[in-house]
């Protein structure tokens, strides 16, 4: 059995990127004329089709992925590429990730799906103590850099405390992995392809609230968006706002309302949380003198605290006000009281006003 698995999955250890028609988009490049209007889940699906098509050593697996997945992100993959490359797994997250580590260590590209980010915790040991440290503890003789773990995360309006959590901060404390969160269909496709082809393990969180809500023109060809490069979504002079994922939609609405009050807001999408783009945030804060960070996860120990600490270290004498955080509450994610838990537009707008008027 073991020998058969080795023969099936061992494909060598190199990860060629050039020569396959890939193109790297800058974070500000315009969508090509060949772009097609699609939502976020369709963009994810298209990226997975491209990943499997361009590399015969790539595999997709997880709970119900053979049927298209609960959010339909893997629709059509099993029919097109066969059940030997796209297949279902038992309901066992540590097994899904552990199997993915083994496949990646044998030179394959692995896209392992955790059905909901809330259930990634049974795989925590595999991600933190195995995937993240595999290269280091072997003295770079072995690695599982071909592993990408996809997981839908965040509020959805009716998920409650088992289907709404944002666990990104748990993984941002771990050297050896990357954490990526897209905000839109175009970003999702390019960032997912970059994550799959990156030589390091990546945890790729997908904001499920945007799966069908976010729609825009997306290039249909094979392209990648660089990891660890933040994007200034809108320029401003009075205050810098930093966020990621679905929360950026709420933050942008707050920026528009603040602009009506004469407050100029600069909005930055981190895209990659680890390693994050410190320079672009620092440059912005040195210009505006103020910083507000917003995320859905609870405020205490959230990744916003790391951003705040870093910017205070780098920009202390340029700050005009304390760094502000507008985040989820320090409570289990509630079902009925979700609107009170969430960092809403009005909460962000109030924080903008108080920070600017400090």
From Swiss-Prot:
Thiamine diphosphate binds at residue 119. Keywords: Metal-binding, Mitochondrion, Oxidoreductase, Potassium, Transit peptide. Gene3D superfamilies: 3.40.50.920, 3.40.50.970. It comes from the Eukaryota. K(+) binds at residues 145, 147-148, 198, 200. Induction: By dark treatment. Down-regulated by sucrose in a hexokinase dependent manner. Up-regulated by Leucine and its derivative alpha-keto acid (KIC). GO terms for molecular function: 3-methyl-2-oxobutanoate dehydrogenase (2-methylpropanoyl-transferring) activity; metal ion binding. Expressed in the non-photosynthetic organs such as siliques, flowers and roots. Its main location: mitochondrion. GO terms for cellular component: mitochondrial matrix. It is an enzyme of class 1 (oxidoreductase). Its EC number is 1.2.4.4. Its cofactor is thiamine diphosphate. It catalyses: N(6)-[(R)-lipoyl]-L-lysyl-[protein] + 3-methyl-2-oxobutanoate + H(+) = N(6)-[(R)-S(8)-2-methylpropanoyldihydrolipoyl]-L-lysyl-[protein] + CO2. It is found in: Mitochondrion matrix. Heterotetramer of alpha and beta chains. The branched-chain alpha-keto dehydrogenase complex catalyzes the overall conversion of alpha-keto acids to acyl-CoA and CO(2). It contains multiple copies of three enzymatic components: branched-chain alpha-keto acid decarboxylase (E1), lipoamide acyltransferase (E2) and lipoamide dehydrogenase (E3). Required during sugar starvation and acts under the control of a sugar-sensing mechanism involving Ser/Thr kinases and phosphatases. This is 2-oxoisovalerate dehydrogenase subunit beta 2, mitochondrial. It comes from Arabidopsis thaliana (Mouse-ear cress). The lineage of its organism: Eukaryota, Viridiplantae, Streptophyta, Embryophyta, Tracheophyta. The gene is DIN4.
């Amino acid at each position: 059995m073991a020998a058969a698995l080795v023969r099936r999955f061992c494909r060598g250890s190199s990860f060629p990127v050039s020569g396959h028609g890939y193109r790297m988009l800058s974070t500000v490049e315009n969508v090509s004329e060949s772009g097609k209007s699609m939502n976020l889940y369709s963009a994810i699906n298209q990226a997975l089709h491209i990943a499997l098509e361009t590399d015969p050593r790539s595999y997709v697996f997880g709970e119900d992925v053979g049927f298209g997945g609960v959010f339909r992100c893997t629709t059509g993959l099993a029919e097109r590429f066969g059940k030997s490359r796209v297949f279902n797994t038992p309901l066992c997250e540590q097994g899904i990730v552990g199997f993915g580590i083994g496949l990646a260590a044998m030179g394959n590209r692995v896209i392992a799906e955790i059905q909901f980010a809330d259930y990634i915790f049974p795989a925590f040991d595999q991600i933190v103590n195995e995937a993240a440290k595999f290269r280091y503890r072997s003295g770079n003789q072995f690695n599982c850099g071909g592993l990408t773990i996809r997981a839908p995360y965040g509020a959805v309006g009716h998920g409650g405390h088992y289907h709404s959590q944002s666990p990104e901060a748990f993984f941002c404390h771990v050297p050896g992995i990357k954490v990526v969160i897209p905000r839109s269909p175009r970003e999702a496709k390019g960032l997912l392809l970059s994550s799959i082809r990156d030589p390091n393990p990546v945890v790729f969180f997908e904001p499920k609230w945007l799966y069908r809500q976010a729609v825009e023109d997306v290039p249909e060809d094979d392209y990648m968006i660089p990891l660890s490069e933040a994007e200034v979504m809108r320029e401003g002079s009075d205050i810098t706002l930093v966020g990621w994922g679905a929360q950026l939609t709420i933050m942008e609405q707050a920026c528009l309302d603040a602009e009506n009050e004469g407050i100029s807001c600069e909005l930055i999408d981190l895209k990659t949380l680890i390693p994050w783009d410190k320079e672009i945030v620092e440059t912005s804060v040195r210009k505006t003198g103020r910083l507000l960070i917003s995320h859905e996860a609870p405020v205490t120990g959230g990744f916003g605290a790391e951003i705040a600490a870093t910017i205070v270290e780098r920009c202390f004498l340029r700050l005009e006000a304390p760094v502000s955080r507008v985040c989820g509450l320090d409570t289990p994610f509630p079902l009925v009281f979700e609107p009170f838990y969430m960092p809403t537009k009005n909460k962000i707008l109030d924080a903008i006003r108080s920070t600017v008027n400090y």
